[in-house]
């Protein structure tokens, strides 16, 4: 399979290039960065593109890829419901290309979200803390947003988090994502980390995942690259590829 990388000179993108080049069943075709022409992907007969760019350009990238029948595996964050609906419209109008967008490709991070969803209904309190390097463009992270939404879905019908806070500084209790408080930390020296804290009478449970190196994303990305042609249209997350129950 012929694979290109958008954002190839970025820290994550360069890691993806190395991962593709190390895979016996994949061929790296070309890397494209800011200022480069996307047509290089067509000229090199690229079949699948890995996109780790920026929220400000990812939609234009996807429109080009879909229009040219190139599959896309996207790790760029900043996808709102409106953006996802737009991608679905493009895919419906141009059958033949598939897109997989995941808030996190680290297998451990995906499993931690799955575990959090399973635990959610057993605890009366839950909060999410995500910690990243200071160059990250969005807050909260896509992983934290998805985690909170999965938890909220699992807690449907349950009372809201107990919280007697009546005064305080704006933002002190974090962002509210479907009723789940989410707190963002940006700190030099970090890569990508998340804690989900659960509490109930007499006990707490913490589910934590740490990506200490960007190579943690490679196995999940390459799994998506190998499976993308089997999943027409838009796929969110790599959970469907992991056979999680």
Swiss-Prot record:
Classification via SUPFAM superfamilies: Glyceraldehyde-3-phosphate dehydrogenase-like, C-terminal domain, NAD(P)-binding Rossmann-fold domains
UniProt subcellular location: Cytoplasm
EC identifiers of the protein: 1.17.1.8
Keyword Lipoprotein: no
Catalysed reactions, semicolon-separated: (S)-2,3,4,5-tetrahydrodipicolinate + NAD(+) + H2O = (2S,4S)-4-hydroxy-2,3,4,5-tetrahydrodipicolinate + NADH + H(+); (S)-2,3,4,5-tetrahydrodipicolinate + NADP(+) + H2O = (2S,4S)-4-hydroxy-2,3,4,5-tetrahydrodipicolinate + NADPH + H(+)
UniProt GO molecular function: 4-hydroxy-tetrahydrodipicolinate reductase; NAD binding; NADP binding; oxidoreductase activity, acting on CH or CH2 groups, NAD or NADP as acceptor
Amino-acid positions noted as binding (S)-2,3,4,5-tetrahydrodipicolinate in the UniProt annotation, renumbered to this chain: 133, 142-143
Pathway: Amino-acid biosynthesis; L-lysine biosynthesis via DAP pathway; (S)-tetrahydrodipicolinate from L-aspartate: step 4/4
Pfam families: DapB_C (PF05173), DapB_N (PF01113)
Family listed: Belongs to the DapB family.
Protein name as annotated: 4-hydroxy-tetrahydrodipicolinate reductase
Species of provenance: Mycolicibacterium vanbaalenii (strain DSM 7251 / JCM 13017 / BCRC 16820 / KCTC 9966 / NRRL B-24157 / PYR-1)
Native organism taxonomy: Bacteria, Bacillati, Actinomycetota, Actinomycetes, Mycobacteriales
Chain's gene name: dapB
């Amino acid at each position: 399979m012929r694979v290109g990388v958008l954002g190839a000179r970025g820290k994550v993108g360069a890691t993806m290039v190395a991962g593709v080049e190390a895979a016996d069943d994949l061929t790296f075709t070309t890397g494209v960065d800011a200022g480069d022409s996307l047509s290089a992907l067509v000229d090199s007969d690229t079949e699948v593109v890995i996109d780790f760019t920026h929220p400000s350009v990812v939609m234009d990238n996807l429109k080009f890829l879909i229009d040219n029948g190139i599959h896309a595996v996207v790790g760029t964050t900043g996808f709102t419901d409106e953006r996802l609906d737009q991608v679905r419209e493009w895919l419906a109008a141009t059958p033949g290309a598939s897109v997989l967008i995941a808030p996190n490709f680290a297998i451990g991070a995906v499993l931690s979200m799955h575990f959090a969803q399973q635990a959610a209904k057993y605890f009366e309190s839950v909060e999410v803390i995500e910690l990243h390097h200071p160059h990250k463009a969005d807050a909260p992270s896509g992983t934290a947003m998805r985690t909170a939404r999965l938890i909220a879905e699992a807690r449907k019908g349950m009372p809201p988090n107990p919280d007697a806070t009546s005064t305080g500084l704006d933002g002190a209790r974090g962002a509210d994502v479907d009723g789940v408080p989410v707190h963002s930390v940006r700190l030099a020296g970090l890569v990508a980390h998340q804690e989900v804290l659960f509490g109930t009478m007499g006990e707490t449970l913490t589910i934590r995942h740490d990506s200490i190196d960007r190579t943690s994303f490679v196995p999940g990305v390459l799994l998506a690259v190998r499976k993308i042609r089997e999943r027409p249209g838009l796929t969110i997350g790599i959970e469907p590829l992991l056979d999680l129950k």
